[in-house]
Amino acid sequence: MLKYRRITTADDEAIAKIVRTNLERLHLDIPGTAYYDPELAHLSVYYNGTPTKRCYFIALDEVDRVIGGVGIAEFNGIEDCAEMQKLYLDDSAKGKGYSKELVAAAESWAKDTGYKKLYLETHSNLTVAMKLYEKLGFKQIEKPECVLHGTMDHFYLKSL
């Protein structure tokens, strides 16, 4: 079972590196993706700055090394909806079911916080992720008008 906790400033550098490494490998280190998000270098400040609306879970290995994470934040494009953001794992953590556990943690936190729906956006290069989202009950929707990451081309929603 995966060990995870809320992000701290000590995690910022490690999780930013994991996000950037994944996006570089997928040729998504381009404008319109999380690669260029201004808060990427300081995710703890962004998520902990509004703790009643946002949360970022850091996944840890058996020696407490950061191996990934997932964020949840308010999404203003759909009523009572949170957005699941920046679900990424280090290569050493892939293929072990950790993404599924992180999604479950995100869903649980969002539901407990009062959100009724969970939205996410992704890119067609992330085929493994899209299969996971669909398997976990996310339904593909049309692109919402308020999308900030213009490069994303697949959009999903799930009722909690």
Which residue stretches match the model-derived regions?
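Acetyl-CoA-dependent GNAT
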Residues: 2, 6-85, 90-91, 103-105, ...
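Short coil/turn segments at alpha/beta junctions that flank glycine-rich nucleotide-binding fingerprints
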Residues: 26, 96, 112-116
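Active-site acidic-Proline motif in GNAT/NAT acetyltransferases
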Residues: 90-96, 124
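Conserved acyl-CoA
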Residues: 101-117, 132
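Conserved phosphate-binding and hydrolysis motifs of nucleotide-dependent enzymes
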Residues: 68, 97-99, 137
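C-terminal "cap" of GNAT-fold acetyltransferases
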Residues: 25, 116-160
